[in-house]
């Protein structure tokens, strides 16, 4: 058979990829720590759509520049979220999201997981998470948790410090329930 486009290694090594001023390299995620300690950086209500998480419209032009596009995560709900999350990420503090029912409904927008990942979000704890959005979260290294008791959502507050000990082992074992500890409120939450 004939091969299409065979290039030798020397020629490939000389090829450069040019990106325009608005195209950045895709970000990589850090590995999940053994024990996840973080801060609830935002608490959102029920029925948060992917458009609430990652606005489109005039912001969509930045989709190839994840650092820039990430400046608008949760903008319709909390315009200061991305600044807060980036500051915590830069201090090596993981960001956590607390959410109500049907988190991530709407269009399957990968950037609604990619941009929060870039900002250091490691887990979403929700009453329920839409199936496709949950898959996108997993694909970008964000753990989608649902509360065993939906009422636990009510006890969590923005800025609470939360720890999920043994998270990496729990993921590898496929545990169906994990314990989280709200260190600020002194309460245990089952996810």
What is each of the regions a protein language model found here?
Residues 1-6:
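Short, small-residue-biased leader/transition segments that mark boundaries at the very start
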Residues 7-125:
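Non-catalytic terminal/interface segments that mediate subunit docking, oligomerization
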Residues 8-10, 35-36, 90-91, 138, ...:
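A generic structural signal for short, non-catalytic loop/turn and secondary-structure boundary residues
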Residues 12, 37, 94, 121, ...:
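Active-site lining segments that contact anionic ligands and/or coordinate catalytic metals
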Residues 30-32, 49-50, 57-62, 68-70, ...:
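NTP/phosphate- and nucleic-acid-binding module
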Residues 66, 78, 85-86, 130, ...:
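Short, structured coil/loop segments at alpha-helix boundaries
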Residues 129-183:
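A structural-propensity feature for long, helix-poor, extended segments
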């Amino acid at each position: 058979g004939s091969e299409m486009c065979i290039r030798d290694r020397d020629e490939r090594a000389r090829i450069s990829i040019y990106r325009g001023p608005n195209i950045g390299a895709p970000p990589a995620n850090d590995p999940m720590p053994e024990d996840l300690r973080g801060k609830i950086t935002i608490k959102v209500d029920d029925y948060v759509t992917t458009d609430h998480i990652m606005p489109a419209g005039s912001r969509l032009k930045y989709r190839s520049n994840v650092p820039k596009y990430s400046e608008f995560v949760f903008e319709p709900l909390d315009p200061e979220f991305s600044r807060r999350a980036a500051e915590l990420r830069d201090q090596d503090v993981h960001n956590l999201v607390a959410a109500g029912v049907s988190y991530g409904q709407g269009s399957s927008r990968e950037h609604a997981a990619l941009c929060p990942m870039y900002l250091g979000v490691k887990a979403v704890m929700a009453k329920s998470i839409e199936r496709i959005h949950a898959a996108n979260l997993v694909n970008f290294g964000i753990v989608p948790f649902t509360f065993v008791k939906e009422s636990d959502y009510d006890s969590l507050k923005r800025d609470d410090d939360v720890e999920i000990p043994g998270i990496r082992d729990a993921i590898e074992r496929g545990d169906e329930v994990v314990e989280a500890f709200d260190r600020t409120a002194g309460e245990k939450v089952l996810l």
